[in-house]
């Protein structure tokens, strides 16, 4: 997972 906004439960957009 990286900085940004969450799109999934396992990661983010960025």
Swiss-Prot record:
Expressed by the venom gland. GO terms for cellular component: extracellular region. One of its GO terms (molecular function) is ion channel inhibitor activity. InterPro entries: LCN-type_CS_alpha_beta_dom. It comes from the Eukaryota. The keyword Acetylation does not apply. Keywords: Disulfide bond, Ion channel impairing toxin, Neurotoxin, Secreted, Toxin, Voltage-gated sodium channel impairing toxin. Residues 2-14 form the LCN-type CS-alpha/beta domain. The keyword Disulfide bond applies. It is found in: Secreted. Contains 4 disulfide bonds. Belongs to the long (4 C-C) scorpion toxin superfamily. Sodium channel inhibitor family. Beta subfamily. Has the structural arrangement of an alpha-helix connected to antiparallel beta-sheets by disulfide bonds (CS-alpha/beta). Beta toxins bind voltage-independently at site-4 of sodium channels (Nav) and shift the voltage of activation toward more negative potentials thereby affecting sodium channel activation and promoting spontaneous and repetitive firing. This is Beta-toxin Cn9. The lineage of its organism: Eukaryota, Metazoa, Ecdysozoa, Arthropoda, Chelicerata.
